[in-house]
């Protein structure tokens, strides 16, 4: 019984499965056709709507937005133009121009600096070499040059010591007797004293006379107090005019 039941169930299941599959295939075909038709219809409708409604609206909105943005940008440009010019001027005159100037100065001065450094270096080398060569030649030409120089220096020192005014400090004790003044020198000093006194008196008299002459000249220049007081008194204008009248009359008489 079990096998017959299983076989009957399998036959029934195969029939039911075939029916269900056929139904599903038909439903899928129907749904696919419906979806295709709906898609075509929606596409056509959307094209019509977009072409007649959305596209013109989008274009108008785009033009309006661009116009507003241009107006705002122009307004901002007008406001920011002085600042932009200021920034450009600062850049060109305070950054770019000094940088270019420094660059040009560096380009022009660096070769000169290199040449000058080489010239100094070569000058040092040449001078050192020439000095060494000439010292070598002098050592062969005048081997006793150092001794002659030392002798000349000692002679100069001795001459200076002899000419030094305070040379009595270096005198030996044996020479002190020769430095004591004698009676003849004392007599000569006594004879010379009155002559010196007469000269000093004559000089004093000359200086006294010159000072007195200077005093007299200064006294003559300075008027006494009374005359200064009289001179400082103001003179009226009428008196001044009267003083000039006789001069005019005398001038007229002379001319006549």
UniProtKB/Swiss-Prot annotation:
Location of Phosphoserine modifications: 210-211
Cellular compartment(s): Endoplasmic reticulum membrane; Nucleus membrane
Record's compositionally biased regions (Low complexity): 203-215
Topology in membrane: Multi-pass membrane protein
Transport keyword on record: no
Membrane-crossing residue ranges in chain numbering: 5-25, 30-50, 64-84, 105-125
Keyword Transmembrane helix: yes
Cellular component GO terms, alphabetical: endoplasmic reticulum; endoplasmic reticulum membrane; nuclear envelope; nuclear membrane
Alphabetically ordered keywords of this record: Endoplasmic reticulum, Membrane, Nucleus, Phosphoprotein, Transmembrane, Transmembrane helix
Disordered: region residues: 198-256
Protein name (Swiss-Prot/TrEMBL): Uncharacterized membrane protein C1919.04
